[in-house]
């Protein structure tokens, strides 16, 4: 029995030793990366292209690379027709122009502006290869692009019920003004135009591919379709009523060759909507926006103008782009998430892409030596499914939700009806922002657009005061007049009230007048007065639903004539006429 016990003890000892050696081995392996012998160094980091904006780790913390969400794409087989080329030897120079134009000419007695919101008679009278004035600055004519390793481009043009004459002039100007080796192809996307034959006829021209949407898709999804079939490494998006000027393409492609994360646009000259005269635009303009998220052109300030005039051929940093005409590396376009496919038709996508490019490590630039003329129409000749106002609010609301952080409250204050827009699911767009480790909107305002005036922060908390289904409303009344009650609409405005804890005042956000019901007279009607004339003793007691002033509570009762009376009365815990619901509104705080 004893030998057997000794034998078992020996085996146990051996197993224990093996176990201890195993633990030691695991520990050494796990710590070896941080215990390198002297003289041994980690492999060098790859060199970063100094021209490409980088996202350095913050606070010495290396963030892991996020997995990429799928590139937003559209199933072309389901809802798109690609027109066949049945004639093999047609070039843009041998295309039967007269036959093509005669099928859509304006006729005497017809409204010249109805179909296109520009003078079609004037457009039809022009030669499709007319000469336009060289609007470039003199220094641009001396720039040599021959030593820059430029990649070719696919030009993508979407159109919907475009006049044949303006569309053909657009296509011919691209061919005529672009070096053949840099223009791989033109992709036309017909967004379900009434005249299907336009696309079929243009598809016969070599180096043109024509897609037709089987239903109306809008510019955004049409452009993504065009990008999906594009074969060139650079995408150039153009509108369907433009004319390219001399050497318009080289500055765009050269800049992308230097900086693949630059999104570049030409200076957009003006083609007069009435007579089609070509007018050169100022090079001192750049893109901006206001807090309703409407794009606007703005003149550079004096400092920026001095810098531009000192380097007249250099790229112009622009906070936003108009969106109709720009070039981008296809790889960068896909990495950025193409377009937001849940936006509708047109509008707001240019600001969304502008924010995305800047905040995610790219740059947005206007190339002063690239000029393209554009017909700026005063109104849209086509309808927007769902209405143009609703479409624009949905699109801009999506942009604000994804990119503007706390500053979206400024947008919502300026466009209060946007609060009620169903903007859909933005999960995929937020995932793109997270994956690319994009910067904040605060960074964008400070580093890209410091010239934009930011509204002063609201001092205090903003409320909508509800009692039942009615809200306290200033009714746009003046000083010494009484506010009223009105159906709650949730859009702020006359129903937005601001409680300032510091000054102990309760004022209307629009009129800036304060509520006054502190009179010693019981049941005295509340009035609105200048805040500086009011004793600071207003308090919000949310748990009771009270708004108090001078020991009285704001009270509501309905008079004999059905009118609502609002006054100060002795506070009573069980008085429902004094129990307000303070609904906090989004504000920039």
From Swiss-Prot:
Cytoplasmic topological intervals: 1-11
Principal location class: Golgi
Region of interest (Catalytic subdomain A), residue spans: 150-255
Superkingdom, natural source: Eukaryota
Cofactor(s) the protein needs: Mn(2+)
Lumenal topological domain: 32-589
Listed transmembrane segments: 12-31
Pfam families (UniProt xref): Glycos_transf_2, Ricin_B_lectin
Binding site for substrate: 191, 216, 240, 346, 377, 380, 382
Membrane topology field: Single-pass type II membrane protein
Keywords: Disulfide bond, Glycoprotein, Glycosyltransferase, Golgi apparatus, Lectin, Manganese, Membrane, Metal-binding, Signal-anchor, Transferase, Transmembrane, Transmembrane helix
InterPro entries hit by this protein: GalNAc-T, Glyco_trans_2-like, Nucleotide-diphossugar_trans, Ricin_B-like_lectins, Ricin_B_lectin
Pathway it works in: Protein modification; protein glycosylation
GO cellular component, one term: Golgi membrane
EC number: 2.4.1.41
GO molecular function annotations of the record: carbohydrate binding; metal ion binding; polypeptide N-acetylgalactosaminyltransferase activity
Disordered: annotated segments: 33-73
Glycosylation: residue positions: 523
Protein family membership: Belongs to the glycosyltransferase 2 family. GalNAc-T subfamily.
Domain notes: There are two conserved domains in the glycosyltransferase region: the N-terminal domain (domain A, also called GT1 motif), which is probably involved in manganese coordination and substrate binding and the C-terminal domain (domain B, also called Gal/GalNAc-T motif), which is probably involved in catalytic reaction and UDP-Gal binding.
Name recorded for this polypeptide: Polypeptide N-acetylgalactosaminyltransferase 4
Gene: gly-4
């Amino acid at each position: 029995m004893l030998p057997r016990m000794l034998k078992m003890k020996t085996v146990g000892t051996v197993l224990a030793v093996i176990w201890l050696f195993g633990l030691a081995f695991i520990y050494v392996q796990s710590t070896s990366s941080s215990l390198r012998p002297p003289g041994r160094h980690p492999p060098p980091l790859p060199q970063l292209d100094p021209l490409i904006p980088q996202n350095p780790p913050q606070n010495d913390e290396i963030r892991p690379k996020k997995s990429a969400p799928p590139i937003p794409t559209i199933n072309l087989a389901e809802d798109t027709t690609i027109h066949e080329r049945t004639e093999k030897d047609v070039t843009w120079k041998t295309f039967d122009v007269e036959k093509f134009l005669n099928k859509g000419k304006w006729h005497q007695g017809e409204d010249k502006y109805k179909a296109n919101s520009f003078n079609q008679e004037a457009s039809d009278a022009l030669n499709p290869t007319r000469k336009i004035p060289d609007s470039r600055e003199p220094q641009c004519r001396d720039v040599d692009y021959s030593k820059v390793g430029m990649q070719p481009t696919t030009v993508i043009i979407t159109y919907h019920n475009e006049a044949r004459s303006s569309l053909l002039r657009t296509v011919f100007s691209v061919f005529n003004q672009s070096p053949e080796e840099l223009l791989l192809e033109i992709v036309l996307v017909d967004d379900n135009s009434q005249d299907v034959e336009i696309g079929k006829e243009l598809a016969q021209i070599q180096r043109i591919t024509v897609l037709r949407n089987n239903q109306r898709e809008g510019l955004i999804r049409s452009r993504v379709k065009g990008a999906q079939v594009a074969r060139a490494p650079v995408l150039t998006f153009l509108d369907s009523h433009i004319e390219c000027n001399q050497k318009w393409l080289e500055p765009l492609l050269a800049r992308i060759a230097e900086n693949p994360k630059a999104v570049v646009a030409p200076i957009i000259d003006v083609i007069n909507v009435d007579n089609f005269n070509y007018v050169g635009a100022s090079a001192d303009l750049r893109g901006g926006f206001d807090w309703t998220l409407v794009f606007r052109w703005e003149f550079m300030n004096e400092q920026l103008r001095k810098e531009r005039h000192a380097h007249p051929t250099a790229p112009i940093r622009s906070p936003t782009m108009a969106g109709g005409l720009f070039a981008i590396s296809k790889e960068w376009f896909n990495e950025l998430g193409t377009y937001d496919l849940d936006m509708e038709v047109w509008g707001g996508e240019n600001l969304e892409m502008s924010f995305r490019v800047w905040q995610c490590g790219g740059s947005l630039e206007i190339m002063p030596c690239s000029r393209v003329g554009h017909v700026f129409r005063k109104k849209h000749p086509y309808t927007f499914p769902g209405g143009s106002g609703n479409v624009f609010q949905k699109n801009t609301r999506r942009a604000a939700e994804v990119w503007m952080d706390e500053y979206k409250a400024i947008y919502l204050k300026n466009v209060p009806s946007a609060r009620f827009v169903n903007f859909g699911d933005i999960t995929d767009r937020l995932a793109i922002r997270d994956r690319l480790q994009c910067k904040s909107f605060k960074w964008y305002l400070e580093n890209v657009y410091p010239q934009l005036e930011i509204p002063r922060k609201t001092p205090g908390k903003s409320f909508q005061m509800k009692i039942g289904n009615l809200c306290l409303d200033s009714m746009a009344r003046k000083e010494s007049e009484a506010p009223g009650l009105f159906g709650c609409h949730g859009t702020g405005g006359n129903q937005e009230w601001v409680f300032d804890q510091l000054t102990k005042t309760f004022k209307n956000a629009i009129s800036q007048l304060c509520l006054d019901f502190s009179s010693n007279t019981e049941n005295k009607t509340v009035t609105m007065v200048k805040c500086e004339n009011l004793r600071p003793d207003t308090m919000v007691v949310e748990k009771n639903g009270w708004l108090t002033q001078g020991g009285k509570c704001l009270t509501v009762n309905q008079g004999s004539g059905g009118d609502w009376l609002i006054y100060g009365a002795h506070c009573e815990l069980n008085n429902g006429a004094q129990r307000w619901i303070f609904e906090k509104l989004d504000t920039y705080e």
